[in-house]
Curated annotation (Swiss-Prot):
Glycans are attached at residue 114. It comes from the Eukaryota. It is a single-pass membrane protein. Coiled coil: none annotated. The keyword Cell membrane does not apply. One of its GO terms (cellular component) is membrane. It is found in: Membrane. The keyword Transmembrane applies. This is Uncharacterized protein YBR255C-A. It comes from Saccharomyces cerevisiae (strain ATCC 204508 / S288c) (Baker's yeast). Keywords: Glycoprotein, Membrane, Transmembrane, Transmembrane helix. InterPro entries: Rcf3.
Length: 120
């Protein structure tokens, strides 16, 4: 499959870094969700007669919901940070290429700076 062009964000190094960051953020979010679910469950058990009378399955669902919600929200927040940093670095790289080309007397179109790479 020679000649396939893939965007730079398919770079294995970038994908590995993103996977690591999202995994760490998900674990932190899950821990925060667990702390919140435990604290709120204790308060609900103390003050809510409805919560005291629900079955174990409902309580487990309540805890799982908070844990997963914490993990998802934290991972999404980390993804947005990663994208912002990635595009900022990409913009700096493009500006550097444009400046170097201008110093040499070459004037490149912004389209020619696409950060695509070909796979061989």
């Amino acid at each position: 499959m020679g000649g396939n062009v893939l965007p730079i964000h398919y770079d294995p190094k970038t994908v590995k870094q993103l996977t690591k960051e999202i995994t760490v953020a998900s674990c932190i979010g899950a821990a925060q969700g667990a702390l919140f679910s435990i604290a709120s469950a204790l308060l609900l058990r103390r003050f809510s007669s409805v919560y005291r009378n629900v079955r174990t399955q409902v309580r487990v669902f309540y805890h799982c919901s908070w844990i997963s919600m914490g993990a998802v929200f934290r991972a999404d927040k980390q993804l947005l940070k990663f994208q912002t940093n990635y595009y900022r670095e990409e913009q700096k790289r493009r500006e550097k290429i444009m400046d170097e080309a201008a110093e040499r007397g070459l004037f490149l179109e912004d389209e020619s700076l696409n950060s695509s790479r070909s796979t061989t």
